[in-house]
Amino acid sequence: MPTGEERARLVQEMFDRIANRYELLNTLMTAGLHRVWNKKAVEATGLRAGGWALDLACGTGSLTRDLAGRAGPKGYVLGIDFSREMLRAAKKRPVPGIEYQLGDATDLTGVESGSFDAATIAYGARNIPDLDTLFAEMARVVRPGGKVVCLEIAQPEGRLSATFYGLWFDRIVPLLGSKVSGDAWAYSYLPESVKEFVAPDGLADIMRCNGLQDVTWRGFSGGIVTLHVGTKPG
């Protein structure tokens, strides 16, 4: 698999291509469980009515809308993604209190420090080569006591879960993704990117090294998804 700028370009182009089928495929590939996982992530933010949240790698806005639902009509949620087509799809489902911007999750120079109650990234961290900068920026933009939440696909450790995972993600997901989206590379990239991603304990260490404390993580659905949560000191 390509690395560096070439990989970033290919991944960006991939998301542009699959944007219109992205949410349908998420539902098919997870049997709808992604909605449950997203709910867990939203709960972990501790976001209150009227709160402000930043959703990085927001894609078509699935988690962004859930955050807005929790923040309520007086809240504000900013969704940032590097794919124009994913943002175009997100904007087709407008929700009061949400703003979408094209941008880089590792370069939030336009976002004021300490301006958000929570920052989230769901299923996007494994697409970002520089995790140190990602989490340093997420920690910077949340207020003291604010939460940084990362929801990500993982490799399960249990034998039964690992066997199912191997069958599903290595064989069925690429076939299903190719048939529905017409993009074979996109859904062969998915299992490969998960295999290459840092282990959950390692991800927790990266968060701790970049301005976050009380970092915890837990797995869901047999460990195929992990939820990491850290708090900005203060």
Show the residue positions of the predicted features.
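Core SAM-dependent methyltransferase catalytic element
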Residues: 211-234
